[in-house]
């Protein structure tokens, strides 16, 4: 009863014991350090190889092989050393464009690597030339010969015989142009212009049309393919009319005697041109009864180009131009190039003889320098000037607006008033 109760202490957590490196953190850190050293070594080798000459690259590879084979890295395992050195050779060979099988044969790092095909052939020297020889196509295939090695033509132009071998950048000097400047293989950049025989072959390759001349020579048989209007062929009686294919294809000039009358094919198909007196106007068109009996008084516009009504020209020979026959559907009669005083066609609506805007009844007609705006009789119907008359009607300038404040424009020689070309704005 008198014994005292024993008080037990609460258990305290103990620190965990030191376990070994189960996660392998220290081992991974060691591998990272090894890889960093290897990367630094590769960077130094690359920096050295970039500055090396192409001739000394093979010697550099041999030195690297000896260095890697003799001085081993103590941190790299022995089993992985050969594999990584061979992988280093493969990477360097890809950068330097070197046959990998040749390197494998030299270093003997892989037992499966065989002697490459480029060392077995007898023409291994052709791979070093800029253009592969035709007999080296078997041994120079693959990485030893570039695909576009045949882009350069030989001086004897033997490869220019086939179009597939002669590329567009052919720069052969071709002493014998018969083999180089062929139609199927000669290129524009081929320098074959110094030999006379080359011009013949080039002329046969690139034929120039006979009408690439300043004037067409009608004595040649291919004259009618020319489209120059200044061509006048043999047998053409009308000097103003070109032969078929050389100017006016719609005009047949065979036996045309009268220039004022249209020949066969030029407007009057049923009217003969011999004398131009035996043909009546009714033969040209039935509704041309109002024309005179002379065939030449009825214009070729009676053939239907004027449309509804017949063009009535009382006397065709009073027109100064030789052919007053070009009519259009827009105009009733168009005397192209004729003077209105000589040509008696009733051009009362619209006419080509008045070279202004008066005959078109536009509001700007009174600003033009024509006889219509000067109060003289013209081809227009009525009086076209609705604005005031010019201050100097006797002057030939035809000025409408004149003001003393105007400083630009022309001055009349008599009154010396300045002309406001765009209207008086005062």
UniProtKB/Swiss-Prot annotation:
Tissues in which the UniProt entry reports expression: Expressed in the inflorescence meristem and intercalary meristem. Expressed in the bract primordia of primary and secondary rachis branches.
Domain G protein gamma residue range list: 24-107
GO-annotated biological processes: floral organ structural organization; G protein-coupled receptor signaling pathway; regulation of seed development
One Gene Ontology cellular component: plasma membrane
Keywords on record: Cell membrane, Membrane, Nucleus
Cell compartments where the protein resides: Nucleus; Cell membrane
Main subcellular localisation: nucleus
Cysteines joined through disulfide linkages: none
Classification via InterPro entries: GG3-like
Keyword Membrane on entry: yes
Phenotype of the disrupted gene, per the record: Semi-dwarf phenotype. Dense and erect panicles, and high grain number per panicle. Increased number of spikelets. Increased tolerance to drought, salt and cold stresses.
Miscellaneous notes: Involved in tolerance to cadmium and copper ions. Seedlings overexpressing DEP1 exhibit enhanced tolerance to cadmium.
Function recorded in the entry: Guanine nucleotide-binding proteins (G proteins) are involved as a modulator or transducer in various transmembrane signaling systems. The beta and gamma chains are required for the GTPase activity, for replacement of GDP by GTP, and for G protein-effector interaction. Involved in the regulation of plant architecture, panicle erectness, panicle and grain length, grain weight, and grain yield. Involved in the regulation of grain size.
Subunit structure comment from the entry: G proteins are composed of 3 units, alpha, beta and gamma.
Record protein name field: Guanine nucleotide-binding protein subunit gamma 4
Organism, scientific name: Oryza sativa subsp. japonica
Gene name in the database record: DEP1
């Amino acid at each position: 009863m008198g014994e005292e109760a024993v008080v037990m202490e609460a258990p305290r957590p103990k620190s965990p014991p030191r376990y070994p490196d189960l996660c392998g953190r220290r081992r991974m850190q060691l591998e990272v350090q090894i890889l960093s050293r290897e990367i630094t070594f590769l960077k130094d080798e690359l920096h050295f190889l970039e500055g090396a000459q192409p001739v000394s690259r093979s010697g550099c590879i041999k030195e690297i092989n000896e260095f890697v084979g003799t001085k081993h890295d103590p941190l790299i395992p022995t089993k992985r050393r050969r594999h990584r050195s061979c992988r280093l050779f493969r990477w360097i060979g890809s950068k330097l464009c070197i046959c990998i099988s040749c390197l494998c044969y030299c270093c003997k790092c892989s037992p499966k690597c065989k002697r490459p095909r480029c060392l077995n052939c007898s023409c291994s020297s052709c791979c070093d030339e800029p253009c592969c020889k035709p007999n080296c196509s078997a041994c120079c295939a693959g990485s030893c010969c570039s695909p576009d090695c045949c882009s350069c033509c030989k001086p004897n132009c033997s490869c220019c015989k086939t179009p597939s071998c002669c590329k567009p950048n052919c720069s052969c000097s071709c002493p014998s142009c018969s083999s180089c400047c062929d139609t199927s293989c000669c290129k524009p950049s081929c320098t074959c212009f110094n030999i006379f025989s080359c011009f013949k072959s080039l002329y046969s390759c690139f034929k120039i049309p006979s009408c690439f001349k300043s004037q067409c020579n009608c004595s040649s048989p291919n004259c009618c393919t020319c489209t120059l209007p200044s061509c006048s062929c043999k047998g053409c009686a009308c000097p103003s009319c070109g032969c078929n294919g050389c100017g006016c294809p719609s005009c047949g000039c065979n036996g045309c005697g009268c220039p004022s009358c249209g020949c066969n094919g030029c407007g009057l198909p049923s009217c003969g041109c011999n004398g131009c007196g035996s043909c009546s106007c009714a033969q040209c068109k039935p509704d041309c009864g109002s024309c005179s009996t002379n065939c030449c008084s009825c214009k070729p516009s009676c053939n239907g180009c004027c449309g509804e009504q017949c063009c009535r020209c009382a006397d065709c020979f009073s027109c100064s131009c030789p052919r007053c026959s070009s009519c259009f559907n827009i105009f009733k009669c168009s005397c192209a190039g004729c003077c209105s005083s000589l040509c008696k066609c009733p051009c009362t609506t619209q006419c080509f003889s008045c070279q202004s805007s008066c005959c078109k009844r536009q509001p700007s007609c009174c600003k033009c320098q024509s006889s219509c705006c000067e109060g003289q009789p013209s081809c227009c119907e009525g009086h076209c000037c609705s604005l005031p008359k010019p201050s100097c009607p006797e002057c030939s300038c035809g000025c409408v607006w004149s003001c003393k404040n105007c400083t630009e424009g022309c001055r009349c020689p008599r009154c010396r008033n300045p002309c406001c070309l765009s209207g008086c704005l005062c």
